[in-house]
Regions:
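Acidic, aliphatic-rich amphipathic alpha-helical segments
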Residues: 10-110, 163-164, 169-181
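C-terminal interaction segments
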Residues: 1-20, 122-181
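Glycine/small-residue-rich hydrophobic helix-like segments
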Residues: 96-135
Length: 181
């Protein structure tokens, strides 16, 4: 089965027209599961092969979040929390470590590795911290906002000599590029 990261990369390359039939099929499957007509599978077939159902649903949600960001549609708080957690999980799986901590209160925090040599943090407040609100993180993680724009506009607070390396780790899913932005 494909990892969350592999599925995310494939979805990043898809257009909304490519994803619509798959989303429709997934919604039908979810409806069948919720009405009890068939047992819920642990894995589903995706465009890139089999994946865990929960991972696939989370990435489908991320695609919906990206469409909302591109359209300027306000998202419910619960959706923002889930989207932040999912994107932070992918970021942690891709760049996990103990040098930089990215905080997105109240949704999540993730510890990341420096792209250069950096201190290995174990307890207490780490020396390299970046913190943003959920909207800013979603925009950064999906490519609708660059790191430099976020810094210039005071939308992210940072401390430590390695925290600027986060710019190299973002976006997690470049949906803005796919939307022509």
């Amino acid at each position: 089965a494909h990892t969350l990261i592999e599925v995310a990369r494939q979805i990043e390359e898809d257009s909304p027209e490519d994803l619509l039939p798959q989303a429709s099929s997934l919604l039908s499957t979810v409806e069948e599961r919720l009405t009890g007509t068939r047992p819920t599978p642990a894995r589903v077939e995706t465009l890139v092969g089999p994946a865990r159902l929960t991972d696939h649903l989370r990435l489908t949600m991320i695609d919906g979040v990206c469409m909302a960001l591109a359209s300027g549609i306000a998202l419910p708080r619960a959706v923002k929390v889930d989207a932040c957690r999912t994107l932070a999980t992918i970021l942690g799986q891709t760049h996990g470590g103990r040098t930089i901590e990215l905080r997105v209160p109240p949704a999540t925090a993730v510890q990341l590795e420096s792209t250069t040599a950096g201190p290995d943090h174990h307890r207490g407040t780490p020396p390299n911290v970046a913190e943003s609100d959920m909207e800013t993180f979603l925009a950064l993680a999906t490519g609708f906002l660059s790191w430099s724009q976020a810094r210039e506009n005071g939308r992210i607070s940072t401390s430590g000599s390695h925290v600027e390396e986060l710019a190299e780790m973002l976006p997690v899913v470049d949906a803005a590029h796919r939307c022509g932005r």
